[in-house]
Amino acid sequence: MAVTKLVLVRHGESQWNNENRFTGWYDVDLSDKGRTEAKAAGQLLKKEGFTFDFAYTSVLKRAIHTLWNILDEVDQVWLPVEKSWRLNERHYGALQGLDKAETANKYGDEQVKQWRRGFAVTPPELDRADERFPGHDPRYASLTAEQLPTTESLALTIDRVLPYWNESILPRMKSGEKVIIAAHGNSLRALVKYLDNMSEEEILELNIPTGVPLVYEFDENFKPIKHYYLGDADEIAAKAAAVANQGKAK
Protein backbone atom coordinates (compact mmCIF):
# COMPACT_ATOMS: atom_id res chain seq x y z
CA MET A 1 0.00 0.00 0.00
CA ALA A 2 1.37 3.37 -1.02
CA VAL A 3 1.71 5.75 1.92
CA THR A 4 1.91 9.53 1.54
CA LYS A 5 3.46 11.52 4.37
CA LEU A 6 2.73 15.11 5.33
CA VAL A 7 4.78 17.03 7.90
CA LEU A 8 3.18 19.76 10.01
CA VAL A 9 5.27 22.01 12.26
CA ARG A 10 4.05 24.71 14.59
CA HIS A 11 6.56 27.57 14.60
CA GLY A 12 9.22 27.61 17.30
CA GLU A 13 8.67 29.68 20.42
CA SER A 14 8.08 33.34 19.52
CA GLN A 15 9.06 36.39 21.51
CA TRP A 16 5.46 36.80 22.61
CA ASN A 17 5.09 33.10 23.46
CA ASN A 18 8.03 33.71 25.78
CA GLU A 19 6.29 36.77 27.24
CA ASN A 20 2.98 34.84 27.47
CA ARG A 21 1.09 37.34 25.31
CA PHE A 22 -1.74 36.79 22.84
CA THR A 23 -0.16 37.08 19.40
CA GLY A 24 -2.61 36.26 16.62
CA TRP A 25 -1.74 38.14 13.42
CA TYR A 26 0.81 40.38 15.13
CA ASP A 27 4.12 39.73 13.37
CA VAL A 28 6.59 38.89 16.14
CA ASP A 29 9.76 36.93 15.47
CA LEU A 30 11.14 33.77 17.02
CA SER A 31 12.87 33.90 20.37
CA ASP A 32 16.36 32.43 20.70
CA LYS A 33 14.72 29.29 22.08
CA GLY A 34 12.36 29.24 19.10
CA ARG A 35 15.23 29.33 16.62
CA THR A 36 16.86 26.45 18.50
CA GLU A 37 13.57 24.51 18.37
CA ALA A 38 13.26 25.09 14.62
CA LYS A 39 16.80 23.90 13.98
CA ALA A 40 16.20 20.85 16.17
CA ALA A 41 13.04 20.05 14.17
CA GLY A 42 15.08 20.18 10.97
CA GLN A 43 17.75 17.94 12.47
CA LEU A 44 15.11 15.40 13.52
CA LEU A 45 13.61 15.37 10.04
CA LYS A 46 17.03 14.91 8.48
CA LYS A 47 17.85 12.07 10.89
CA GLU A 48 14.59 10.33 9.94
CA GLY A 49 15.38 10.70 6.23
CA PHE A 50 12.69 13.23 5.29
CA THR A 51 13.05 15.27 2.12
CA PHE A 52 10.47 17.55 0.53
CA ASP A 53 9.28 18.79 -2.85
CA PHE A 54 7.25 21.78 -1.70
CA ALA A 55 6.70 23.87 1.42
CA TYR A 56 3.82 25.98 2.70
CA THR A 57 3.83 28.62 5.40
CA SER A 58 1.93 31.70 6.55
CA VAL A 59 2.83 35.34 5.91
CA LEU A 60 4.05 35.78 9.51
CA LYS A 61 7.78 35.76 10.16
CA ARG A 62 7.76 33.34 13.11
CA ALA A 63 6.44 30.60 10.81
CA ILE A 64 8.55 31.70 7.83
CA HIS A 65 11.75 31.73 9.89
CA THR A 66 10.88 28.34 11.38
CA LEU A 67 10.59 26.96 7.86
CA TRP A 68 13.87 28.60 6.83
CA ASN A 69 15.69 26.96 9.73
CA ILE A 70 14.18 23.56 9.00
CA LEU A 71 15.03 23.73 5.30
CA ASP A 72 18.56 24.82 6.17
CA GLU A 73 19.02 21.76 8.39
CA VAL A 74 17.69 19.33 5.76
CA ASP A 75 19.80 21.11 3.11
CA GLN A 76 16.81 22.16 1.00
CA VAL A 77 16.86 25.96 1.22
CA TRP A 78 16.20 26.02 -2.53
CA LEU A 79 12.77 24.42 -2.08
CA PRO A 80 9.79 26.27 -3.61
CA VAL A 81 7.70 27.87 -0.86
CA GLU A 82 4.16 29.24 -1.00
CA LYS A 83 3.12 31.74 1.69
CA SER A 84 -0.56 32.31 2.41
CA TRP A 85 -2.52 34.38 4.92
CA ARG A 86 -4.89 31.41 5.10
CA LEU A 87 -2.27 29.61 7.21
CA ASN A 88 -1.92 32.54 9.62
CA GLU A 89 -2.60 32.10 13.31
CA ARG A 90 -6.16 32.63 14.45
CA HIS A 91 -6.87 36.34 14.88
CA TYR A 92 -7.25 37.10 18.59
CA GLY A 93 -9.03 40.43 18.13
CA ALA A 94 -8.62 42.97 20.91
CA LEU A 95 -6.70 40.42 23.01
CA GLN A 96 -3.64 40.69 20.74
CA GLY A 97 -0.69 41.96 22.76
CA LEU A 98 -2.29 41.30 26.16
CA ASP A 99 -0.64 39.12 28.81
CA LYS A 100 -2.51 35.79 29.00
CA ALA A 101 -2.12 35.32 32.75
CA GLU A 102 -3.17 38.91 33.50
CA THR A 103 -6.19 38.45 31.24
CA ALA A 104 -7.06 35.25 33.13
CA ASN A 105 -6.75 37.10 36.44
CA LYS A 106 -9.22 39.68 35.13
CA TYR A 107 -11.76 37.46 33.35
CA GLY A 108 -11.13 34.01 34.89
CA ASP A 109 -9.37 30.87 33.65
CA GLU A 110 -12.48 29.38 32.04
CA GLN A 111 -13.29 32.49 29.97
CA VAL A 112 -9.71 32.69 28.72
CA LYS A 113 -9.71 28.96 27.94
CA GLN A 114 -12.84 29.47 25.85
CA TRP A 115 -11.27 32.44 24.05
CA ARG A 116 -8.11 30.42 23.39
CA ARG A 117 -9.54 26.98 22.67
CA GLY A 118 -13.33 27.22 22.29
CA PHE A 119 -14.54 26.12 18.86
CA ALA A 120 -17.08 28.84 18.07
CA VAL A 121 -16.10 31.45 20.68
CA THR A 122 -14.62 34.70 19.36
CA PRO A 123 -12.44 36.98 21.52
CA PRO A 124 -13.51 40.64 21.86
CA GLU A 125 -13.52 42.30 18.44
CA LEU A 126 -10.82 44.68 17.24
CA ASP A 127 -11.93 48.10 16.00
CA ARG A 128 -11.09 48.60 12.31
CA ALA A 129 -9.50 51.94 13.20
CA ASP A 130 -7.09 50.16 15.57
CA GLU A 131 -3.51 50.05 14.28
CA ARG A 132 -3.54 46.27 14.90
CA PHE A 133 -6.29 45.75 12.29
CA PRO A 134 -4.73 43.84 9.35
CA GLY A 135 -6.33 46.18 6.80
CA HIS A 136 -3.54 48.66 7.61
CA ASP A 137 -0.84 46.12 6.65
CA PRO A 138 0.32 46.08 3.00
CA ARG A 139 0.77 42.29 2.99
CA TYR A 140 -3.04 41.98 3.12
CA ALA A 141 -3.75 44.57 0.41
CA SER A 142 -5.26 41.94 -1.93
CA LEU A 143 -7.81 40.72 0.64
CA THR A 144 -11.43 41.84 0.54
CA ALA A 145 -13.05 43.63 3.48
CA GLU A 146 -14.91 40.40 4.29
CA GLN A 147 -11.65 38.42 4.42
CA LEU A 148 -9.97 40.79 6.89
CA PRO A 149 -10.77 39.58 10.41
CA THR A 150 -11.40 41.73 13.45
CA THR A 151 -11.53 38.55 15.56
CA GLU A 152 -11.76 34.81 14.86
CA SER A 153 -12.98 31.62 16.48
CA LEU A 154 -11.43 28.28 15.59
CA ALA A 155 -14.53 27.64 13.46
CA LEU A 156 -13.79 30.78 11.41
CA THR A 157 -10.13 29.76 11.17
CA ILE A 158 -11.23 26.41 9.72
CA ASP A 159 -13.36 28.28 7.18
CA ARG A 160 -10.24 29.89 5.70
CA VAL A 161 -7.79 26.98 6.15
CA LEU A 162 -9.86 24.19 4.59
CA PRO A 163 -10.38 25.78 1.14
CA TYR A 164 -6.61 26.23 0.94
CA TRP A 165 -6.07 22.61 1.94
CA ASN A 166 -8.54 21.35 -0.67
CA GLU A 167 -7.54 23.70 -3.50
CA SER A 168 -3.76 23.89 -3.11
CA ILE A 169 -2.14 21.54 -0.59
CA LEU A 170 -4.05 18.29 -1.16
CA PRO A 171 -3.83 18.44 -4.99
CA ARG A 172 -0.07 18.86 -4.69
CA MET A 173 0.12 15.79 -2.44
CA LYS A 174 -2.08 13.84 -4.87
CA SER A 175 0.38 14.67 -7.65
CA GLY A 176 3.06 12.84 -5.65
CA GLU A 177 4.86 15.78 -4.06
CA LYS A 178 6.21 15.53 -0.51
CA VAL A 179 4.91 18.50 1.48
CA ILE A 180 5.85 20.29 4.70
CA ILE A 181 3.70 22.98 6.33
CA ALA A 182 5.14 25.39 8.90
CA ALA A 183 2.28 27.31 10.48
CA HIS A 184 0.66 28.16 13.81
CA GLY A 185 -1.05 26.52 16.76
CA ASN A 186 -4.60 27.28 15.66
CA SER A 187 -4.26 27.04 11.88
CA LEU A 188 -2.76 23.59 12.48
CA ARG A 189 -5.46 22.71 15.04
CA ALA A 190 -7.99 23.64 12.35
CA LEU A 191 -6.38 21.21 9.93
CA VAL A 192 -5.93 18.47 12.54
CA LYS A 193 -9.61 18.72 13.55
CA TYR A 194 -10.57 18.12 9.94
CA LEU A 195 -8.06 15.33 9.28
CA ASP A 196 -8.92 13.44 12.47
CA ASN A 197 -12.66 14.25 12.39
CA MET A 198 -12.43 15.54 15.96
CA SER A 199 -15.42 16.81 17.90
CA GLU A 200 -15.66 20.35 19.24
CA GLU A 201 -15.02 18.96 22.72
CA GLU A 202 -11.95 17.00 21.62
CA ILE A 203 -10.36 19.95 19.84
CA LEU A 204 -10.80 22.08 22.97
CA GLU A 205 -8.20 19.90 24.72
CA LEU A 206 -5.71 19.70 21.84
CA ASN A 207 -2.49 21.66 22.36
CA ILE A 208 0.21 21.56 19.69
CA PRO A 209 3.77 22.07 20.99
CA THR A 210 6.14 24.55 19.35
CA GLY A 211 8.81 23.34 16.97
CA VAL A 212 7.96 19.61 16.95
CA PRO A 213 7.38 17.82 13.62
CA LEU A 214 3.95 16.15 13.43
CA VAL A 215 3.83 13.48 10.72
CA TYR A 216 0.59 12.36 9.08
CA GLU A 217 0.45 9.22 6.95
CA PHE A 218 -2.29 8.84 4.31
CA ASP A 219 -3.51 5.82 2.34
CA GLU A 220 -3.94 5.74 -1.44
CA ASN A 221 -7.32 7.49 -1.05
CA PHE A 222 -5.66 10.25 1.00
CA LYS A 223 -7.42 9.27 4.19
CA PRO A 224 -5.25 9.64 7.32
CA ILE A 225 -3.96 6.30 8.61
CA LYS A 226 -2.00 7.53 11.60
CA HIS A 227 -0.05 10.47 12.94
CA TYR A 228 2.86 10.87 15.33
CA TYR A 229 5.33 13.42 16.63
CA LEU A 230 9.05 13.04 16.04
CA GLY A 231 11.15 13.30 19.20
CA ASP A 232 11.13 12.30 22.85
CA ALA A 233 7.55 11.54 23.97
CA ASP A 234 8.00 12.88 27.51
CA GLU A 235 9.52 16.14 26.29
CA ILE A 236 6.72 16.59 23.75
CA ALA A 237 4.03 15.95 26.40
CA ALA A 238 5.67 18.51 28.70
CA LYS A 239 5.74 21.10 25.91
CA ALA A 240 2.06 20.51 25.09
CA ALA A 241 1.16 20.88 28.78
CA ALA A 242 3.09 24.15 28.92
CA VAL A 243 1.00 25.46 26.01
CA ALA A 244 -2.19 24.53 27.88
CA ASN A 245 -1.03 26.34 31.01
CA GLN A 246 -0.26 29.64 29.25
CA GLY A 247 -3.81 30.90 29.64
CA LYS A 248 -4.13 30.31 33.38
CA ALA A 249 -4.11 32.93 36.10
CA LYS A 250 -1.06 33.25 38.33
From Swiss-Prot:
Class of the enzyme per the UniProt entry, highest EC level: isomerase
Isomerase is among the record's keywords: yes
Residues given in the record as substrate binding sites: 10-17, 23-24, 62, 89-92, 100, 116-117, 185-186
GO MF annotations, alphabetized: phosphoglycerate mutase activity
Active site, per annotation: 11 (tele-phosphohistidine intermediate), 89 (proton donor/acceptor)
PROSITE patterns named among the record's database cross-references: PG_MUTASE
Domain of life: Bacteria
Residue(s) at site: Transition state stabilizer: 184
Swiss-Prot/TrEMBL catalytic activity: (2R)-2-phosphoglycerate = (2R)-3-phosphoglycerate
Keyword Isomerase: yes
Any matching Pfam family: His_Phos_1
EC number from the UniProt entry: 5.4.2.11
Stored InterPro entries: His_Pase_superF_clade-1, His_PPase_superfam, PG/BPGM_mutase_AS, Phosphogly_mut1
GO biological process terms on file: gluconeogenesis; glycolytic process
Pathway assigned in UniProt: Carbohydrate degradation; glycolysis; pyruvate from D-glyceraldehyde 3-phosphate: step 3/5
Keywords associated with the record: Gluconeogenesis, Glycolysis, Isomerase
Record's function text: Catalyzes the interconversion of 2-phosphoglycerate and 3-phosphoglycerate.
PANTHER family listed in its UniProt record: PHOSPHOGLYCERATE MUTASE
Family: Belongs to the phosphoglycerate mutase family. BPG-dependent PGAM subfamily.
Complexes and interactors: Homodimer.
Name of this protein: 2,3-bisphosphoglycerate-dependent phosphoglycerate mutase
